[in-house]
């Protein structure tokens, strides 16, 4: 287990002290880490000044609860920053991860703040699914004594923009809650909106919440576990790419790469279940094509975050070029008065369809216009890092991190196009080349604390990545618990990712069972959800034996189909109706026995 400092905080340790602390705690169990935390707290509080302080009972200080519901870490960072702002204002605040929130307590909340992102087709983040389901159930209590505010993060390139935040906001009001502030829906470039909203929240709460004594101004909850690393999304580690290996066959329709990155002596730590954030640069050839289509030269000066840069450099390093959005299409149409695009303006569905099927460079190619450099920059969104599920355990690979990358490649009317980050890693970073990375910790996708607990892993395609990390960790720990893998892809001969490794784990007895679904090797398509139904009786036995279930991969189709198959298995072999099966699976989620890493 690792410990986590809010990204905005400055570590009070020098690199040598940090390395010693990490070395001393790297092999401790969660229970041992909790004891060590208490031990150091006790040492600190043996100081005379501390002994003299007598804090008032917490029960006398009804305060503010912040619920963080994050998928990629952005919502968590906003929640942590708000927590810090409220502490600075001497307000009593508790910050809790949505997955750890005892949602039956919600009726007793007086001041409630929800910071949430949205995933998939307007769904809440994985860690907030149980809370969301509870609030929308008949069990949800009235909240007449609760004042609340919601900050929602989303991406306007998706149809259900900020839907999770809209859901929480409307439901809390419907249950009788009082809005402290109107909901804020923030797009990808959320920082300015978040900063303004945080200031408004602090002002609104100062008049409602009691000021806490210094000893009471503390935040609790899983969000506040400390991950000791000086590296973050905003301060990434410059690492080097050491291995770039294609692991699909020459006749495969997919290009999947096994990527290994050398972390050197950085001390960067991660756990199985975490994600690797990768900052990439756009393809110079794509930048050149876009610039020339707009009759620009590329050396025009533009302003980016207060700095003056040549247009080419700004486009390569700072702006999103490979993902189009409805807003970009609409703004480009209005700006250029394009006869092709103007009819789409005002029709959300048509704009979204066009954006989803037409990259920015092809939009310009099909509807040419002349823009000045600043107008182009103002049209685009800032470049954001991509997250990849980590496919390794440091118990085996030490100062390396591995990821499994499905390279996005497609044609648009004869022009080859590719994904920004995936093609950067696959095509443009040379061996030993620099890659800027950071760890996005995911405490909602963790191996069981008890090594004897059985594990069921469901991961078709590149969803196999975290389970490679899981197996490395289980093997290194010599964990006696059983392990069962469900994997699927189009063809056995071309698409069996990490085949030799899985076969070795089976031979060594580490992988107890493996079920494989090859969707294109026979007339009828077979998927992992079909294998789940086929093995329903045994699956139910494992669940009854306390197994933890993990799902990784596509959120929109696979994860939903897998969940439906699990519900059917639970209903059939558990003798339950549909409603009871759904309740059973929800309880597994609350108990952290059903965890998903979907995207």
Curated annotation (Swiss-Prot):
PROSITE patterns referenced in this protein's UniProt entry, alphabetically: FAD_FR (PS51384), FLAVODOXIN_LIKE (PS50902)
Reaction equation(s) it catalyzes: hydrogen sulfide + 3 NADP(+) + 3 H2O = sulfite + 3 NADPH + 4 H(+)
Swiss-Prot/TrEMBL GO biological process terms: cysteine biosynthetic process; hydrogen sulfide biosynthetic process; sulfate assimilation
Sorted UniProt keywords: Amino-acid biosynthesis, Cysteine biosynthesis, Electron transport, FAD, Flavoprotein, FMN, NADP, Oxidoreductase, Transport
Key word Transport present: yes
Domain FAD-binding FR-type: 234-448
Cofactor: FAD; FMN
Binding site for NADP(+): 519-520, 525-529, 561
Assigned EC number: 1.8.1.2
Pfam families: FAD_binding_1, Flavodoxin_1, NAD_binding_1
Entry superkingdom: Bacteria
Free-text comment on the cofactor: Binds 1 FAD per subunit. Binds 1 FMN per subunit.
Pathway assignment: Sulfur metabolism; hydrogen sulfide biosynthesis; hydrogen sulfide from sulfite (NADPH route): step 1/1
Record: residues binding FAD: 322, 356, 386-389, 404-406, 410, 419-422, 599
GO cellular component terms, A-Z: cytosol
GO MF annotations, alphabetized: flavin adenine dinucleotide binding; FMN binding; sulfite reductase (NADPH) activity
KW Ubl conjugation (keyword) present: no
Described function: Component of the sulfite reductase complex that catalyzes the 6-electron reduction of sulfite to sulfide. This is one of several activities required for the biosynthesis of L-cysteine from sulfate. The flavoprotein component catalyzes the electron flow from NADPH -> FAD -> FMN to the hemoprotein component.
Membership in a protein family: Belongs to the NADPH-dependent sulphite reductase flavoprotein subunit CysJ family. In the N-terminal section; belongs to the flavodoxin family.
NCBIfam families on file: cysJ (TIGR01931), PRK06214.1 (NF004859), PRK10953.1 (NF008197)
Record-given protein name: Sulfite reductase [NADPH] flavoprotein alpha-component
